[in-house]
A protein has these predicted regions:
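Conserved phosphate-binding elements of NTP-dependent enzyme cores
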Residues: 1-947
Length: 947
């Protein structure tokens, strides 16, 4: 077998015809600036070719379903193994996907509960047993000799009616006695029952005395009884306790029976197991009063009610007629703040009236109409069910929130399935345990000898998979956690754990920043896992910026030296010791300490105002209080799963968005938030795409394209032709090429194969028609301007201050290499985030904005982090507040204030361990963040405290 993967002539995207040898069966890290070409080499070249070769080996019939894979732009690759890509872009948004289903642990749980679970009656909770005819007879024969027994078969259980036909059928079949509501009656008599009462009726099949020679007779009687009732038998022991038997899983008391247990009954994705009300989703969308009335301090006239069809209270509207009639009944006006309405008035406003209201009809002649009011919530829910309009549904969905299903209480399964237990827990209760707690439960589980024989192999598989999740630092996750709520790093590590479980060897694994979202404390577990995969005989290529991972690597490849057009070359390839001595590698300069992100000389104290959040209780937060000094750069830190996102994203951002931006968001559980009056808006700068269509690009997103179009419209040529700014837009008719509608590409549908995009043969991919492209500014047409990088455009428009200012902010945040017209869909998460930052920086600051960022260093090289920190500090220098969730110590050390959550993840977290400056956190012995921060701060000059 070859010792290297040899890549020759790689030219994908910005790669500059590179040749590289990557050692096999080693842990190899690819690093370099954002946009330098790391992913182009790892995913778009090496992985794409490995995958393509595998697909090529399949039959043409199979290939039509998998799709045709393009050959990467590379001369050849030698020594390639079957490739598995574990990236962050494949997090499932399917609401039916959970941690348990993704890891396949839930499949083993279904097998376990179906085979060794103990069923109970879902109504009374009594244990249900399934017995054969032989077991029933053995039990009866074990009674004391000469015991008299009536063998009964239940035919009616708790049903109203006279049941005349039941008695007639029993007479025809030759039976002489029945027991009605506990009293034995003769069928020769006329039996009259009250129609309105519930009754229990059992046919007396036989009366026997227990003797050794009676076994044959008892067998016949029991078989007859089970045939009549569908498997149920009651042995009424004279002078003793009655015995109930069932051939099926059925409760003799309640008459509820369940089918024989099978694994599919425990699946919430199967109609046999899924809760019939929520179809296994565990949640239901319902109209939420808090989203209809987000601000109860406003009156109806001021727009307190923000629901489709009910927001306009102008005279003459139907809404105003109902509001006035309700006001007349309850003594309020349209100018009364909603919080001033009585409980009765509020209830009728939302859920309607039983009695008719007197509605004043605004006609010329006037008049009064009497009609009940449906209520805003009831009206919206009815319209949501009845409408066929997608627009109307989306309008109403704005007023809806997801609530746990009232039938299964969020547990997704049918009641009879939830009544099956092992060790006192049903399958949903087990799934709600964290990985650690689930492992503890299985280790202390006591089973019978028979259960051990059946379940031991399954339990071993479950334990192994739980162990793999622990080994990648995910011990705080619950198996019931929806996949869509996981971060990119978490979902990637779950798939990594699944791969370890497969124990394959000779595979090429390509990973994209597996350390994202991991605290330094948990990073060691991840590195041990990667080494374990390597030691099995696999090759790992990891795209990574994390220092610890680089120091643990067998081989490092640094792609650069810059980004975009300035990248795409191999700057360095070798061991980490060699990298530290490299003069050319920026990575080596930062790793060796020759370059660094400086600790600020002064920590800001803030503007004296504070944002205080009390009693936070979302997920694992333990009614925790937080204080954020305004006018500071605040970092929220803590181990993975400690509650950072619960506080910042679920409570802080949603509350601020509702109060300051008027968003219809519902904040997570907390007691109160004070200090809102010191802020005027909140902006969440995440890594979501800045546009989801190829028409969106950095120029349109940042707004600089409007200024560029205005400039072109002011040229003499454009004025002579009568062209306005819209002429230079590729989104409207006029200036764009109509053959491709301004896309520059034509989509050709290939049915079984993926759609193919080819350049438009009319405009040759330039998006505009010939006449528009004839208009030039400083010798360049609009297409050529869009084809410039931000750096090139900065020089080109240097004498146009309005445009130059916007472009300069894009350059400041590190987007100098990005083309103005580059499709937003091709930007990485980090690039999209920096485009948002550039847009914010170019706006005039009010000094009262709070910016929220969740792990902004994702995908960023340390040199890019340096630039990002400078940008965030600029936002704070303008008087704003920046709150960042972060694990990167280079960012944490530059903060003014730190909120450190923990001390552990999951149940062991949710508390504030320490709050203060980085120096104060580093001095806290209980803080894991402090322990790792301390040596970082000690390497720098001591910080002067602000006077």
């Amino acid at each position: 077998m070859q010792e290297f993967i040899h890549v020759k002539g790689a030219r994908e995207h910005n790669l500059k015809n590179i040749d590289i040898k990557i050692p096999r069966d080693k842990l190899v890290v690819l690093t370099g600036l954002s946009g330098s070409g790391k992913s182009s080499l790892a995913f778009d070249t090496i992985y794409a070719e490995g995958q393509r070769r595998y697909v090529e080996s399949l039959s043409s019939y199979a290939r039509q379903f998998l799709g045709q894979m393009d050959k990467p732009d590379v001369d050849y690759i030698d020594g390639l193994s079957p490739a598995i890509s574990i990236d962050q872009k494949t997090t499932s948004q399917n609401p039916r996907s959970t941690v348990g289903t993704v890891t396949e642990i839930y499949d083993y749980l279904r097998l376990l509960w179906a085979n060794i679970g103990t069923p109970h009656c879902p109504k009374c909770g009594k244990e249900i047993h399934q017995q054969t005819i032989d077991q029933i007879i053995d039990r009866l024969m074990a009674l004391e000799e000469k015991t008299r027994v009536q063998i009964l078969t239940p035919v009616i259980r708790g049903k109203k009616g006279e049941h005349v036909k039941v008695f007639e059928d029993a007479r025809k079949q030759g039976y002489v006695r029945v027991r009605v509501d506990g009293e034995v009656r003769d069928l020769a008599e006329e039996i009259k029952l009250k129609k309105t009462q519930k009754h229990n009726i059992e046919i007396v099949v036989d009366r026997v005395v227990i003797r050794p020679d009676a076994r044959g007779r008892i067998t016949d009687s029991v078989e007859t009884a089970t045939a009549l009732s569908g498997g149920l038998v009651i042995a009424d022991v004279i002078g003793g306790e009655p015995l109930s038997f069932s051939q099926n899983y059925a409760c003799e008391d309640c008459g509820i029976s369940i089918e024989e247990l099978t694994p599919r009954m425990f699946s919430f994705n199967n109609p046999y197991g899924a809760c019939p009300v929520c179809t296994g989703l565990g949640m239901q969308k319902r109209v939420d009063p808090e989203r209809i009335i987000p601000n109860p301090k406003l009156s109806i006239r001021q727009g307190a009610i923000r629901a489709s069809g009910w927001g306009n209270a102008d005279p003459g509207t139907i809404a105003a007629m109902y509001y006035n009639a309700l006001g007349k009944k309850h003594g309020f006006t349209l100018d009364t703040p909603i919080e001033g309405l009585s409980d009765a008035a509020m209830h009728e406003l939302l859920y309607g009236t039983e009695e008719p209201l007197e509605l004043s009809v605004s006609r010329v002649s006037g008049g009064v109409m009497r009609q009940p009011f449906e209520g805003i919530v009831t009206n919206l829910e009815r319209r949501y069910k009845e409408t066929s309009s997608d627009y109307a549904r989306s309008e109403i969905e704005e007023c809806m929130s997801e609530i746990p299903c009232p039938a299964c209480h969020g547990r997704r399964l049918r009641p009879e399935v939830l009544a099956v237990t092992i060790g006192g827990l049903n399958i949903a209760e087990f799934s709600e345990k964290s990985v650690v707690k689930a492992m503890e439960f299985l280790q202390t589980l006591r089973l019978t000898e028979m259960q051990h024989k059946i379940g031991d192999r399954v339990i071993k598989e479950i334990k192994d998979r739980l162990g793999f999740l622990q080994s990648v630092g995910l011990e705080y996750l619950t198996l019931s956690r929806a996949s869509g709520t996981l971060s990119g790093g978490e979902s990637q590590r779950i798939r990594l754990a699944t791969q370890i479980g497969s124990s394959l060897m000779g595979v090429l694994y390509i990973l994209d920043e597996p350390s994202i979202g991991l605290h330094q404390r948990d990073n060691d577990k991840l590195l041990a896992t990667l080494k374990r995969l390597r030691d099995l005989g696999n090759t790992l290529i990891v795209v990574e910026h994390d220092e610890d991972t680089m120091f643990a690597a067998d081989h490092i490849v640094d792609i650069g030296p810059g980004a975009g057009r300035n990248g795409g070359e191999v700057v360095f390839a070798g061991t980490v010791d060699e990298l530290l001595k490299s003069e050319k590698s920026i990575t080596g300069q930062y790793l060796s300490g020759r370059r660094c992100i400086p600790v600020p000389d002064v920590r800001r104290k803030g503007n004296g105002k504070k944002l205080v959040v009390k009693g936070c209780a979302v997920n694992n937060l333990k009614h925790t209080d937080f204080t954020i000094p305004l006018g500071t750069f605040t970092c929220v830190t803590g181990v993975s799963g400690s509650g950072k996102s619960s506080f910042v994203n679920e409570i802080l951002y949603k509350k601020l968005a509702a109060e300051l931006n008027g968003a219809k968001t519902r904040a997570g559980a907390h007691d109160q938030m004070t200090g809102l009056s010191y802020l005027d808006k909140v902006i969440d700068i995440d890594q979501s795409p800045i546009g989801r269509t190829p028409r969106s690009n950095p120029a349109t997103y940042t707004g600089v394209f409007n200024d560029i179009r205005d400039l072109f419209a002011k040229t003499a040529d454009a004025k002579a032709r009568g062209y306005g700014p819209s002429r230079f837009s590729f989104n409207v008719k006029g200036g764009r090429c109509e053959a491709c509608a301004g896309d520059g590409l034509l989509k050709i549908e290939m049915h079984f194969l993926p759609d193919v995009y080819v350049p438009c043969d009319v405009c040759k991919g330039k998006r505009y028609n010939k006449e528009t492209l004839e208009v030039r500014y400083k010798g360049k047409n609009i297409y050529e301007v869009l084809d410039m990088t931000v750096d090139e455009a900065c020089e080109f428009f240097s004498n146009v201050p309005k445009i130059a200012r916007r472009l300069e902010t894009m350059r400041e945040v590190g987007l100098g290499y990005v083309k103005l017209g580059q499709s937003s869909t091709t930007l990485s998460g980090g690039e999209a985030q920096r485009a948002k930052l550039a847009t914010e920086l170019s706006k005039r600051s009010t000094g009262k904005t709070i910016y929220i960022l969740d792990e902004p260093t994702t995908g960023l090289h340390v040199a890019d982090v340096h630039r990002l920190v400078d940008v965030l500090q600029k936002l704070v220098d303008a008087g704003n507040t920046v709150v960042v969730i972060e694990h990167n110590l280079d960012v944490i050390k530059t903060a003014d204030y730190i909120l450190d959550l923990g001390p552990e993840g999951g149940d062991g977290g949710g508390r504030l361990v320490v709050a203060g400056t980085p120096e104060e956190v580093a001095a806290c012995e209980n803080s894991y963040t402090g322990q790792y921060l301390k040596p970082v701060l000690e390497r720098k000059n001591h910080v002067k405290s602000e006077e």
